[in-house]
Amino acid sequence: EKEKSKEKAEFAKKCLEEYADFVPMFLLLDETARVLRKKRMTRGAVDFDFPECKIILDAKGRPVEIKPYERNAATMLIEDCMLAANETVAEDYYWQQIPFLYRTHEKPDEEKIRRFAILINNFGYSLHIGNGEVHPKEIQKLLSRAAGTPEEAMLSRLALRSMKQAKYTTDCVGHFGLAARYYTHFTSPIRRYPDLQIHRIIKENLHGRLGEKRLSHYGKLLPEAAVWTSSRERLAEEAERETEKAKK
C-alpha cells in the first residue's frame, strides 16, 4: 500500500512538472466546475453514485482483473463541464426554434412514486409529494439522508426504478434527474449518433445553410431518429450488462 502511494505521488509530481504551463488553467477550471456543481445540486439535481467496475482483459479478450472505477476530481470536472455544455446548447437551439434532438427525462409516474414513498416509510424515511408530483430535490434530500446507512444502496436503486427512463425526443420537456429545463446530448459526437446529428444541425446553422428545405428535412427526420436511437440505447445497455456478467 505504501509502495502504491509512493508511485502515485511520483506520478503526480511528474505530471505537475510536465504540464506546468496548464496548471493555472486547470485550477481555474476546477473552481468553475465546483461552482457549476453547487448550482446544479442547489436546484435539485439527483446524483446516483453507484459503484462501477472496469474489467481488464488480456489480448484474447479473457478477463484477468476487475477493478473499481474511481470517480475522482478530474472525472467530476469533465462531467460538470459536459453537463453545462449540453444545457447551454439545448437552451440556445430551443429559443431559435430549430428542429433538434433533446435528451428528455420525464417526471416520475404518479403511482410509482406513491408506492416508493410508502415503501421507504418502512425504513423511517419520507418523501414530500405535492399534487401527485415530486420535485427532484426531494429525491436528492432522501439520498443524502440515507448516505452511509445500511439501506443506502437499496434506497438508491429503488429511487432509480421509480423514475422513468431517459430518452431522445424532439420536444424540449426538461430533464428531471438533472433538474434541468433544457438538456441535450452534444458533447460526444464520436460515439453517439444523437450528438453527431446535433453537430450537423449546428454546423449548417452556423454556415447559414438552414433554409426552409433543410428545416423541413430535419422536421421529418428527427422524430424517427429520436425513437430509433432511444431503442438502440436500450439494446446497447442490455448488451453491456450481459457482457459484464459473462466476463465476471
Language-model features: where?
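Conserved, carboxylate-rich catalytic/transport cores that coordinate ions
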Residues: E1-K248
